[in-house]
Amino acid sequence: MEKSNRRKRPSTPHLSCELCRERKIKCDKVDPCNNCVSAGVVCIPVHRPRLPRGVHARRARPMSPTFVPPRAPTPVAGPVPSEKKQTDHSSGAVAAVDDDLRRRVHRLEAVVNSMRAAMQDSSPATVKQVSCEYWGIVGRADEEKSVLNDSYPAPTSSLACNASIPMTVQGQPPFESRPDCFWNNMVGEIEHFGGDVGSSSETKSDDHSSLAPNMPRMGDGGLRFLGLSGNNPTLTWTPVLEGKEMTRQLCQIYLQQVDPIIKILHRPTVEKWMLHGERYLDYPERHVAVDALRSAICYATAASLTDDQCSAIFQRSRSSGIVEDFRRECETALERSGFLVSPSITGLQAFVLYLIARRSEDRGQAAWTLTAVAVRLAKALGLHRERDETFFNQQMRRRLWLTISLMDLQASFSQASEPLISTEEATSTFFLPKHINDSDLDPTMTHEIPDREGLCDTTFALVTYHIQLAGRALNFGTTASPQHKASQQQHAQRFEENALRLLHFCDPESSPYAWFTWHGTQCLVSGARLSALRPLQLPQPSNGSSQPPSSPSPRPQEHNHELLRLALNVLEKAHLMHTDPRGEGFRWYVTMPWHALAVAINECSLSPDVVRIQSAWPTIEACYQLLRRKGVAGQEEAIQRPLEKLICQARDKASPLLQLARSSPTFSLGSSTGTSAAPTPRSRASSTPSDTLSDLSWPTAFSHAPSQLGMELAPVGPVQPFAKLDLDSLLSQFDIQGQPLLAGQIPPVDAELSLRTWEQLMSDIDAESNQLLP
């Protein structure tokens, strides 16, 4: 009787293997099949009853994958052992559940393979092996897991398949009627795993993820999807940081050329960490966030290096791609830190340094796009809100938030867009840090200290913090009106007073930092006065109209000579910082102010004064050539084309007067040469108050530069009671304030024509920006 029953029960058929089924190719149904042997992968045979077809097909009741009976593992080669007999009911249920699982795991496999392909040590064979391991885990459940762990072990970096996938498959509750419940749970497990890897909390010591920074991992925080790594996802470059000595050299340059400008790190703490080998704050050794900060410091330093410094340190020229190598290494460290998943102050500081260096290296839209990420992370960390914390943490959080606010404003100007942080929000979150030296601060300090008098580590940083506040109020306010104009004057006057108060009795000859702070601040103040007369206002529709709002009539004192004088002041200062040897360490930061250049060109093309054009044109040509050599990209092309058209028109008019060869303009700026060599006064007190206080427009000073400026620190001196200061009493031959032209000897230019020409230029820039949109 038993033998007859065995004869009636047919053996389980041998169907196409898993790989052939997925590839939709014919399988010879041997073990292993020839297709899998040729591909060099593990063949996963399928032994089950054939699924019913036609009217006999019916969907089995959904069941939990924990009820899937295990199958015996099949070796890579050799005979297939005899299978266990299964009932028709259990076979049909298992088949239905297998199909449901495979559809979901196939989607999971595609995601995992795409992540694995982006890792450093990825290879096609390894990806195929992981793919087959996933199918084996789903098809054979518990017993297959142990065999795969023993036979085909995967490294820790290969997404920890053996740890995460079986846990998900076995720990699932019974399936619900919703078909994507299993997939959603799988995605939740992956996100949870990525969050653990990317943890960078300052109070938590990570024993496994943070102590292996050189190991590829999937907790990259999604930076690859943001395009940080460009078109090379495998990241197969040679590391640049080969030794501690090179890191020390870069740190020393950072403290001289970057740290006085970008005051988001504590200088003594960085010195103890990178120069003396001590731990960084309370972080464990080789923490991923600390490694990201180290790479960001080196990248920012590389972006600030001159050609001579590159040759001395790396025996390579700057044009050989040394900065790009540091950028890729910084991107890899940021990806490993996972700061998008679990943000921290240290990780955000590294990201801000990366954006500042990226902005100085690349004028495209990458830094503009990623600035939004920095703003969101800062708000996620609560940097825009005041908290009850230690004095040290309070100061560092304020510096970081105001630096990000400044970056947001700079990015909006460079791409002709509104900032993410509104004027109201910037005003309500404006909590100024103390005007002190970094040596006055200590991480263990709990009590507050008063502001210092004189030049400090944070002097220029505080000037730029005032700029980001005034720039929003002046350029992104309400429509033009008498009330708005008065409010702009108040904003401009407040900025000028705050900025110049910080520089009282600053000795610009005492150090490069003092020299650069002196001239940089005066360039900003000149740009503020210029913006009061010619604000950067791109035409925008108003009240549903497609026409730009009409500008108010110019005031009587708004004449050609004042505009040209202020524009030349800005250009003279910017050119001085580009040519004077004392500004060499900060040249990476300064860009040519296209706004002031456009105003100067426009006013020269309308001015009837031959003497004034002859004195101003060499400065204009020199600055225009500097702007062209810097190059533009992305939305900045919209500025370059109308500016080129404007200067061609001005050359046509100026050539008969200056005998200027339009085809090959030369730089014969004798006065500027004298300016570079002339000493700067030691006292800035002035008895000549200025009537024209301006609304500050940030791009008039450093149109697309990152935040602060400075270098080696000057000694501290006392501050006298504030008196109204002149821009610069030694603004060389181009300081035409004292010339009789302003006294009315030359009839002024038609202010209406000047204003219409300026509005036409802004309209052309807006039109070019729209053409660049995809």
Curated annotation (Swiss-Prot):
Compartments, as annotated in UniProt: Nucleus
Single GO biological process annotation from the record: secondary metabolite biosynthetic process
Example of a GO cellular component annotation carried by this entry: nucleus
Compositionally biased region (Low complexity): 536-548, 675-697
Compositionally biased intervals (Polar residues): 665-674
Domain of life, source organism: Eukaryota
Bias (Pro residues) ranges: 67-78
UniProt name for this protein: C6 finger domain transcription factor nscR
Organism: Aspergillus fumigatus (strain ATCC MYA-4609 / CBS 101355 / FGSC A1100 / Af293) (Neosartorya fumigata)
Gene expressing this chain: nscR
